[in-house]
Amino acid sequence: MHNGFDALQLHANRLRGVTIPDLLAAELKRPEQYARQVGPLYFNFARQKYDCVALEALFALARNHNVTGAFQRMFCGEQVNVTEGRAVLHTALRGDLSGTSVAVAAYTAAAKVRERMYALIAGLDASEVTDIVSVGIGGSDLGPRLVVDALRPISQGRFRVHFVSNVDGAAMRRTLDMLDPSRTAGILISKTFGTQETLLNGRILYDWLGGSERLYAVSANPERAVHAFDIVPTQVLPIWDWVGGRYSLWSAVGFPIALAIGSQRFEELLAGAAEFDAYALRVPLEENVAVLHGLTAVWNRNFLGCATYAVMAYDQRLALLPAYLQQLVMESLGKRVKCDGTPVDRDTVPVWWGGVGTDVQHSFFQALHQGTNIVPADFIGTIRNDDLYTENHFALNANLLAQIEVLANGQLSDDPHRVYPGGNPSTLILLDALTPQALGGLIAMYEHSVYVQSVIWGINAFDQFGVELGKHLAVQLLPALKGESVEVVDPVTRAVLVRLRG
């Protein structure tokens, strides 16, 4: 059989007419047997549409693709980013698990940069600066933005951090209009310092601040940062080519995080991720949540034919998590060729999307409950929320449980307009509380789940060539928008340029 895929297709065929309530009735201990606890994180896969026999076939698929060996190669610093010839060592930013010289060197370098970062924070602490504007896009923005927003209520930092990513000048204007330049510092985050959005927004910020005295940078190309904005070299923090943007919040890209929540909280975030790293590397496949989550995604995509995947965050502080995961998953797994350059032989990443509960119940949940598509989902909530509004938290979690149940089980009615077909599989993830440790572990789990999926599909999760062509074309079209004579081949673009130029 084809590396276990054929056997799994037989199981999918066998389970086609089986409902999720049928599975719960057939396996009475399913709610406990399909649950895992990893530190402050609880996972329950009982409402996924597989049984124990199909699940064993999924684990066989993981063994056939040597997922365990793939984890070891990544943690040890082998060049698992084969298309760019690079190691992938974001795990070394938060811990040293493999003991190899490459990983140890990476961990040591990251620790030294954090010391420099904390020294810069101490300097800002002693100044009159109250606000920080962080300029970046993609991986240089989404991760820090998520963490700062999620952990703001328990922040130990004294700085208000404002994020600007879009090249649309309205975003920068809206931010700067509410700040005092004499009490503001800026951080420019760009791996290459060639990103159009960051350079343009950085120039606006430079001019608004009146120079580079309170301007900082994070880059794998520090010389370019110094040259482009005349930033003092000691105010530039390095990152490395073995850290991809969407995996970089653990590095100096997390500078805005540490400023916003405090150095101690940032270390707790790293520790939570490191704890999950140790778990992912050492726990056997059959008990490993990251492996099970990744295999479940493969099952829903390739064997149940689900083309989208939803993330529902039932905690307002995690409102940015769906957007963060959208980038992490779709930029990593949105590939059509394998590592060896041959076409993939099955579908890869579904479209990831989602929102925050209970708002989503009043927007797209109608389509989930009574539409024509089956949409698997992750529901993410918190057990304890130490705020003043406990009654609201009870109501929030009541809605969380109710929606999962109805989406899975459905409900019959004599009125066809009131039938809930059910059949939507979901995974429930609960954080004991939204702490830096728990958030770090949650993000690390998703990183490792993505890697599992990439190994099964034989694709490289760590490049993103698909984003390049559009950026290059935009640079070529920019002079045409300014009225310069530029050859434009595409007839529609040529016609629209006339309209845009007025």
From Swiss-Prot:
What InterPro entries does UniProt report for this protein, alphabetically?
G6P_Isomerase, G6P_Isomerase_C, Phosphoglucose_isomerase_CS, SIS_dom_sf, SIS_PGI_1, SIS_PGI_2
Q: EC number(s) of the enzyme? A: 5.3.1.9
Pathway assignment: Carbohydrate biosynthesis; gluconeogenesis; Carbohydrate degradation; glycolysis; D-glyceraldehyde 3-phosphate and glycerone phosphate from D-glucose: step 2/4
The active-site annotation reads E331, H362, K471
Per its UniProt entry, which superkingdom is the organism in? Bacteria
The name of this protein is: Glucose-6-phosphate isomerase
Taxonomic source organism: Xylella fastidiosa (strain M12)
Q: Which reaction does it catalyse?
A: alpha-D-glucose 6-phosphate = beta-D-fructose 6-phosphate
User: Pfam families of this UniProt entry?
Assistant: PGI (PF00342)
Of which family is this protein a member? Belongs to the GPI family.
Which keywords does the record carry?
A: Cytoplasm, Gluconeogenesis, Glycolysis, Isomerase
Q: Name one GO cellular component term.
A: cytosol
> What compartments host this protein?
Cytoplasm
Output one GO BP term. gluconeogenesis
A GO molecular function annotation here is: glucose-6-phosphate isomerase activity
Task: Give the protein's function.
Answer: Catalyzes the reversible isomerization of glucose-6-phosphate to fructose-6-phosphate.
The UniProt entry, under NCBIfam families, shows: PRK00179.1
